[in-house]
């Protein structure tokens, strides 16, 4: 980590009603003594897409290069970005069995954000008394609920 640049702690989460189904994502960003909450939704998505989107949107909101710690309760996101992505890039976004990587569109966007920051990815057990994770979970649930309400209006 570079001691001369700002440190930001981010908690992310995704939620989906059905898989696929209406989903939401949320992130809590903490910098010094301030925090910012962001959330969003998609009407037809998966839980994994919402997990990736939460991290992507949290990184996109940062205006300058930062030292970042991202906490996620998604092993898919944490392992994907720290372990699997290197081979995906090398294999032109294909897995070792030559199948296309699922959610490659989002993984590619997230991968592009990596060069802008120094990032440490940490897995945290979901629903286990971690206040940042609980906050991100609530934000993702709000996003999911918004998607559900919009779909109700369309019926």
Swiss-Prot record:
GO BP, sorted A to Z: DNA replication, removal of RNA primer
Necessary cofactors: Mg(2+)
Gene: rnhA
Residue ranges annotated for the RNase H type-1 domain, each copy included: 4-145
EC number(s) reported in the record: 3.1.26.4
Function recorded in the entry: Endonuclease that specifically degrades the RNA of RNA-DNA hybrids.
Protein name (database record): Ribonuclease H
Entry binding sites for Mg(2+) 2: 13, 137
Coiled coil, from the record: none
Enzyme class name: hydrolase
SUPFAM superfamilies: Ribonuclease H-like
NCBIfam families recorded: PRK00203.1 (NF001236)
């Amino acid at each position: 980590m570079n001691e001369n640049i700002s440190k930001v702690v981010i908690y992310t989460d995704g939620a989906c009603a059905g898989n696929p189904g209406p989903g939401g994502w949320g992130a809590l960003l903490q910098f010094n003594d301030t925090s910012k909450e962001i959330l969003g939704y998609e009407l037809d998505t998966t839980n994994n897409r919402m997990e990736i989107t939460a991290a992507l949107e949290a990184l996109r909101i940062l205006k300058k290069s930062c030292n970042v710690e991202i906490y996620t309760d998604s092993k898919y996101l944490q392992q994907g970005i720290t372990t699997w992505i290197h081979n995906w890039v090398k294999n032109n976004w294909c897995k070792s069995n030559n199948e296309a990587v699922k959610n490659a569109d989002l993984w590619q966007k997230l991968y592009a954000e990596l060069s802008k920051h120094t990032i440490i990815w940490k897995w945290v057990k979901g629903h286990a008394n971690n206040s940042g994770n609980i906050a991100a979970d609530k934000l993702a649930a709000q996003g999911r609920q918004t998607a559900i309400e919009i779909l109700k209006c369309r019926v």
